[in-house]
Design a protein with these regions (language model features):
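Acidic, Ser/Thr-rich peripheral helices and adjacent loops at domain boundaries
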Residues: 164-178
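Catalytic His-Asp charge-relay segment
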Residues: 217-218
Length: 249
């Protein structure tokens, strides 16, 4: 969606209505037909009635938006039920961003094990991302995790990251984890030209398909996703929840 839509600001819509499961309806079908006609080729998913009369929930790619019946005005933000004291949007958005771990091309990642390695997580990381470096410190503190590491350089932010990512991969299968750790901790680059066969371009394309907007980006065993660097306590809790296990170093 872009500037052509009448209302672009990120809006929180506060509802005093009781929330309920969204349902398909003739009205929702009509809104869907209107959106298809107005915005052909857009990644339009399901359209359902929201708890607010005249407002419809629309899955747009991996985003969740609200629209009125003419398809002109869009609301971006969270819908709250103030009677039930519930955020109606966040759980739906979390479902949309889920990624099944077994669908990831693990041959394009390398595994790093900290402690027992019982908890599993996939990580999309840019070696020049300061938040990724901060997350690595948190991983070291919480322990008991196996990290399937996908090198995902953000060229627009870190022009040197693509070369560094390729050098890390080209360090060789047994040395990739150590090469990554050394660069993240000390900025020590592997001693190679980064010219081997590598998955960096594939990882960038994979991230685009998964709508990954930045790094770090975590994918849990239960499919849940978590963008951004987490404090150690928050990371530990999220790893436990996404793996459904108790912490043990």
């Amino acid at each position: 969606v872009g500037k052509r839509f009448g209302l672009r600001a990120s809006i929180t819509l506060v509802a005093s209505l009781l929330g309920g499961a969204a349902a398909a309806s003739p009205a929702a079908d009509q809104v869907r037909a209107t959106l298809e006609a107005k915005y052909p080729g857009s990644p339009l998913g399901t359209v359902t009635e929201s708890p607010v009369p005249g407002i419809f929930e629309v899955v747009w790619g991996k985003n969740l938006v609200y629209v009125e019946q003419t398809g002109r005005y869009f609301l971006f933000g969270n819908l709250y039920d103030m009677v039930g004291r519930a955020d109606l949007t966040s759980p739906r958005r979390a479902e949309l961003t889920k990624v099944a771990m077994d669908t990831l091309p693990m041959q394009d990642a390398f595994a790093r094990v900290i402690g027992k390695g019982e908890r599993k997580v996939a990580l999309f990381t840019d070696p020049d991302c300061p938040y990724c470096q901060r997350l690595e410190q948190a991983f070291a503190q919480v322990g008991n995790v196996t990290i399937y590491t996908f090198l995902f350089p953000l060229d627009s932010l870190h022009p040197n990251a693509n070369l560094v990512a390729r050098k890390i991969w080209c360090a060789g299968e047994s040395e990739r984890g150590a090469a990554y750790d050394a660069y993240m901790a000390r900025g020590a680059q592997p001693d190679n030209a980064g010219q081997c066969d590598n998955p960096v371009a594939r990882n960038v394309e994979l991230g685009r398909r998964l709508n990954i907007q930045g790094t770090p980006y975590l994918i849990g065993m239960d499919g849940s996703t978590k963008p951004g660097a987490l404090a150690p306590a928050d990371l530990d809790a999220w790893l436990n929840a996404s793996n459904r296990v108790k912490a043990a170093r």
